[in-house]
Amino acid sequence: MSKIIIIGGGIAGLSAGIYARKAGFETTIYEKNGVPGGNCSGWNRNGYHIDNCIHWMTGTREGSTQNRIWHEVGALTDSMNLIKRDSFYVSEWNGQQIALWRDVERTRQEMLAISPEDEKEINCFIDYVRLADTVLTSRQEPKELLHTIDEMTFSLTHAEMAKAFIQYIGLNLEELAMKFKHPLLQHIFLDFMAKEYEAYWLLLAYSFFVSGNGDLPEGGSMGVVHHMTETYRSLGGKLELNTPVEQILINKEKLSIEPPIDKNTLKTKKLKKLIARNADGVRLYNGKTVSADYIICACDINYTFRQLLKKSYIPKSIKKVYSNKKDYPLYSSFQVAFSVDGLLDE
């Protein structure tokens, strides 16, 4: 039986381990922390639970592709309850409130009541969300998709919908917010994530929520990780906690590999053979070396190419991201949790 070492016990690492076990591989996940889950985590503080990750979960709608995957890895189960909120989130400014409701028409009407002068941008935003919702909830078969679009009764024509779609590409949240005149409407877009984030992330996330594909699993982040960990272990997978990996061991012998491409279909110059080396194990920080047939890095990409492997192994596509900080900025984030004496609405 071939052996796979997986570095990192987060959602990616647990998923890789589960699918590898189902495929018949021997697997060991090495996780540096005392609990699995990675960023999908939470803490108990003074009688409160602080969830670090899942504010909504893409793939909660039955029948969606992601829902099937979540069930395969044990993140969701048929017996698990889903928390279905009425609103995605609520923003407040100067004593006024506005929400992104599951009912998008309610969102539209409340936005229009607050700022009639923003009617054009409000309709553009809501219609785009409805369009994205329709596309995301369809099977995306060409005939079905065209039929669905023909049945739409938006306030915009098809040509205008295409124009609206193009208008959102390349915008960040701050640029989207500044399209609106009313400060409260500006705030609801800026309260989602950092202002530098691409605007389409909000549009997609909200459309997932509207379609019932972005609800919250009961138990939150820790519950999802617990179910996935139990699924992995029930399949016979090994999980080593508090065991950081220091380095991936590379075999010195060079291999000559034919490109995995059908050269007859390419109208380019002759492709050269690939010169590569095999990774055949890892060295742990405790000094122990472990051999394996395959290594999967399911950890931070920066740690992978600056610690586990030499910088010379960084692919050109990733090197471009590292060297161009203007077009590919990196953000830091922090989370603040407040203890409130009283009941809160959504």
For each feature predicted by the language model, list its residue ranges.
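Feature captures the FAD/FMN-dependent oxidoreductase FAD-binding
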Residues: E92-M111, S115-D118, A132-D133, R233-S234, ...
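Active-site/ligand-binding neighborhood in enzyme catalytic cores
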Residues: R130-L235, N242
